[in-house]
Amino acid sequence: MAALSCLLDSVRRDIKKVDRELRQLRCIDEFSTRCLCDLYMHPYCCCDLHPYPYCLCYSKRSRSCGLCDLYPCCLCDVKLYCLRPSLRSLERKAIRAIEDEKRELAKLRRTTNRILASSCCSSNILGSVNVCGFEPDQVKVRVKDGKVCVSAERENRYDCLGSKKYSYMNICKEFSLPPCVDEKDVTYSYGLGSCVKIESPCYPCTSPCNPCNPCSPCNPCNPCNPCNPCSPCSPCSPCNPCDPCNPCYPCGSRFSCRKMIL
């Protein structure tokens, strides 16, 4: 459990790091698509549209064209194209970086969902379903006949040339409940990362009742097995109310029984 908790904490830290990088990339993308002269110089400087006769990048560098502080080789005074990289290439790089970060974030979320699903045997989480792209009011959970069904449906409407077009998107996941979980005790929650968690207040049974497992609500002992791991049900153990001896052996050790038979 300690190793699993450490792994989940590491995945959460990675997801937060990716979210921060995505926000930084969005800021860079907004900065790169906007000209600081309040004109869209895309993809070139377009000095003919500048309100000044020339770009004045060298005389008023800090006021008229703030980009020249980053690219000092601007040749706007002679009405040539700027030697800085094209904003289109910067946009393409930013878009590729954003797509890579989104794929990495989706991969981390899938890994987290798999870890949560695999940890169901050691926690009260029975299952986890990813419903990314759906609102909480569009998700429905139904528990019936020992099964949990998670479904979600969304309607998209498009206006095209005066006509309306519709498209539908839906998912449906179903899994069975453990034998010791009551349907009335099953609850669900819409958590972080568009993930629906199915939970129960009682832990699922992981192993059958045996003398080495003490009594618990989900693991009741057999009448022949005492509620003590050190006292298994066998003819060799001493007499006590929870562990009666075999009629062939009196209350004592095996030596006394063998002596009586001889």
From Swiss-Prot:
The modification Phosphoserine is found at S5, S10, S64, S86, S122, S123, S151, S167, S189, S194. Its main location: other. Sequence repeats lie at residues 34-38, 73-77. Residues 34-77 are annotated as: 2 X 5 AA repeats of [RC]-C-L-C-D. GO terms for cellular component: centrosome; cytoplasm; manchette; outer dense fiber; sperm flagellum. Pfam families: HSP20. The keyword Phosphoprotein applies. This is Outer dense fiber protein 1. It comes from Sus scrofa.
